[in-house]
């Protein structure tokens, strides 16, 4: 299974860092990802570092990346 464009497979997860214009933009992006995650009942690890947001999608029960992670990584990338 291939990682969506812009995403890297790191330590068994799909990871990508997004650089937003401002801290407020970064928080707004995180909120959009949170809404997606809640709607799908599947939640990424999220790190906020000023204007940079790093997302990591993986499935705990599978011990790695699943098709669902690939789908949600792609969808969350569209929210940036």
Map each language-model feature to its residues.
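Solvent-exposed alpha-helix faces
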Residues: 31-32, 74
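Amphipathic, hydrophobic secondary-structure cores in small proteins
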Residues: 23, 27, 39-53
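N-terminal first-folded block
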Residues: 1-23
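C-terminal structural segments of small proteins and small subunits
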Residues: 51-79
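A short N-terminal helical cap/helix-turn-helix that marks the beginning
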Residues: 3, 37-47, 74-80
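Preference for bulky hydrophobic residues occupying beta-strand positions
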Residues: 16-18, 46, 55-57
